[in-house]
């Protein structure tokens, strides 16, 4: 998993509340267990018309936001089913940070396991960031995980809180497998001691 230390990029505004995982990645895209290729299905029902053509009114289809790395969204983002394809689709599109006032718990935790930083802010701060994100090609935000700070295009900054363990994992690019590998030496030592003290169990 790629480390997340500091991210600077275009932030796309999506001022919609209760965006569920079915909206993020419709069920038609859930047949695969691969993490790649799902970006094309991200927000598919909103991004595409019935004939498959792009909906020019959807934010991620607008030229200024096609390469967005940050999403500023309404309250209760990621509610609905627990499909891990939702963060996979965001990541495959190129989005590594989602900012909202609240997230569904399962989606929130799945983000950290996939290298995405979900940030919770107050409604006042979200309104400011949503305004920043509405500046089109000038909607550049910098998310500094080391200092727990978001800097807007005008130079103003917003602080955010994050669990220390989750922060450690993102800064070091550690998913569940990475965390286990990090303890590899201790696991090997335990197995040697356990085999010596319980030879009948070997």
Swiss-Prot record:
InterPro entries: 3-IsopropMal_deHydase_ssu, Aconitase/3IPM_dehydase_swvl, AconitaseA/IPMdHydase_ssu_swvl, IPMI_Swivel, LeuD. GO terms for biological process: L-leucine biosynthetic process. The keyword Aminoacyl-tRNA synthetase does not apply. It catalyses: (2R,3S)-3-isopropylmalate = (2S)-2-isopropylmalate. The keyword Lyase applies. Pfam families: Aconitase_C. Keywords: Amino-acid biosynthesis, Branched-chain amino acid biosynthesis, Leucine biosynthesis, Lyase. GO terms for cellular component: 3-isopropylmalate dehydratase complex. Its EC number is 4.2.1.33. It comes from the Bacteria. Pathway: Amino-acid biosynthesis; L-leucine biosynthesis; L-leucine from 3-methyl-2-oxobutanoate: step 2/4. GO terms for molecular function: 3-isopropylmalate dehydratase activity. Catalyzes the isomerization between 2-isopropylmalate and 3-isopropylmalate, via the formation of 2-isopropylmaleate. Heterodimer of LeuC and LeuD. Belongs to the LeuD family. LeuD type 1 subfamily. This is 3-isopropylmalate dehydratase small subunit. It comes from Rhizobium etli (strain CIAT 652).
């Amino acid at each position: 998993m790629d480390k997340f230390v500091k991210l600077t990029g275009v932030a796309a505004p999506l001022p919609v509340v209760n965006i569920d995982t079915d909206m993020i990645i419709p069920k038609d895209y859930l047949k695969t267990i691969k993490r790649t290729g799902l970006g094309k299905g991200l927000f598919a029902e909103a991004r595409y018309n019935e004939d498959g053509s792009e909906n020019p009114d959807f934010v991620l289809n607008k030229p200024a936001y096609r390469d967005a790395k940050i999403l500023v969204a309404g309250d209760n983002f990621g509610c609905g089913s627990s499909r891990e394809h939702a963060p996979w689709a965001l990541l495959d599109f190129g989005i590594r940070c989602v900012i909202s006032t609240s997230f569904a718990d399962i989606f929130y935790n799945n983000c950290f396991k996939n290298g995405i930083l979900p940030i919770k802010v107050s409604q006042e701060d979200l309104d400011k960031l949503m305004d920043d994100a509405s500046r089109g090609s000038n909607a550049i935000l910098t998310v500094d995980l080391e200092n727990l700070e978001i800097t807007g295009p005008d130079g103003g900054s917003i602080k955010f809180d994050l669990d220390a363990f989750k922060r450690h994992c993102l800064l070091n690019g550690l998913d569940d497998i990475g965390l286990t590998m990090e303890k590899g030496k201790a696991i090997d030592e335990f197995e040697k001691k356990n085999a010596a003290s319980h030879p009948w169990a070997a």
